[in-house]
Amino acid sequence: MLDPLKVDSYDYHLPPHLIAKEPVQPADRAKLLIYDRKTDTITHTIFKNLPQFLPQKTHIVFNDTKVIKARIFGHKSSGGKIELLINRPLENERFNVFIRGKVKVGTTLHFSQGLQAIVEELIEDGTRIVTFYHDEKRLSFHELLPILDTIGSIPLPPYIDRAAKKEDETNYQPIFAKKAGAVAAPTASLHFTEQMLNSMAKEFPFHFVTLHVGAGTFKPVEANLITEHAMHSEYYEIPKDTIEVIESDEKVLAVGTTVTRTIEYYVRTKKSFGECDLFLNPLNPPKRVDHLLTNFHLPKSTLIMLVASFIGLETTKRVYQEAIEKEYRFYSYGDAMLIL
């Protein structure tokens, strides 16, 4: 019997060739595994067929965050090369970032287009606090964005293990992305095409939340017990019409783990914006979301634990094993799973 308290219980072996390095084209031709909790059955289909499996009048909630070109390459004054990944903006025009390359407080980093960053603090979790400057002017997030658009690249997850290409700027961005701020895509959204959304909108009400996905989403759980894990936090906001649906009795499909966490955090706090650090797992299951659409996630990640919060650990392992046997493609550019 697997112990849902132990992080090692969420481990599984994934053959490396099943890690998707590129998305399926067109996006809605990805495979879709459907797990029905009422009947304990698994159905295999393609994503385009999603609408015919959803209960009538299901309200669909998407995350409209937009992935920014958060990865930039530069050098120190000494000439040493560095790579910087913006994790999130903070107050007072400061930014939490990851830096590959040794830096200390006070180090100035130089990028193209005259952009500079000064290292202000080294944080215990391995991140750094920096301020950005251009022509000696300290930059806000909105002033930095157009420069990132010019010199930055899309921050593909580490397991994709290749440099970002021009196509990734489209492929790694939901087609309804609107509010800039994420450094990782809400990947369940990547399967939708314009045509599919237009068709579904006639049948299902659409709603949005914003949660700016941080790099912490890829962070492995290093504790031995899930109760010892310190969850990362991410900024979210929920508009009034979405709150009305959350507070109603309508059936809700969350498109992705980020939407799930946002809705469930609101249910627990009644706060329509702020920092979400909710960790859903079998010991802290969802209270409001009825159905989940998601991709296949990394072993021992908080995301596979979230899946297990819906269907239990044993079932999660069984479903994932069947997906591996059926050669589903895993992770951000991979195939999808629907929990009914």
Swiss-Prot record:
Localization, UniProt: Cytoplasm
GO biological process: queuosine biosynthetic process; tRNA wobble guanine modification
Cytoplasm keyword on record: yes
Pathway: tRNA modification; tRNA-queuosine biosynthesis
EC number assigned by the record: 2.4.99.17
Gene3D superfamilies reported for this sequence: QueA-like
Enzyme class: transferase
Keywords: Cytoplasm, Queuosine biosynthesis, S-adenosyl-L-methionine, Transferase
Keyword Transferase attached: yes
Any one of the GO CC terms: cytoplasm
Reaction(s) this enzyme catalyzes, per UniProt: 7-aminomethyl-7-carbaguanosine(34) in tRNA + S-adenosyl-L-methionine = epoxyqueuosine(34) in tRNA + adenine + L-methionine + 2 H(+)
A single GO molecular function term of this UniProt record: S-adenosylmethionine:tRNA ribosyltransferase-isomerase activity
Domain of life: Bacteria
Chief place of localization: cytoplasm
Database matches in InterPro entries: QueA, QueA_dom1, QueA_dom2, QueA_sf
Subunit organization: Monomer.
Family to which the UniProt record says this protein belongs: Belongs to the QueA family.
PANTHER family, alphabetized: S-ADENOSYLMETHIONINE:TRNA RIBOSYLTRANSFERASE-ISOMERASE
Stated role: Transfers and isomerizes the ribose moiety from AdoMet to the 7-aminomethyl group of 7-deazaguanine (preQ1-tRNA) to give epoxyqueuosine (oQ-tRNA).
Protein name as catalogued: S-adenosylmethionine:tRNA ribosyltransferase-isomerase
Organism: Nitratiruptor sp. (strain SB155-2)
Gene name, Swiss-Prot/TrEMBL: queA
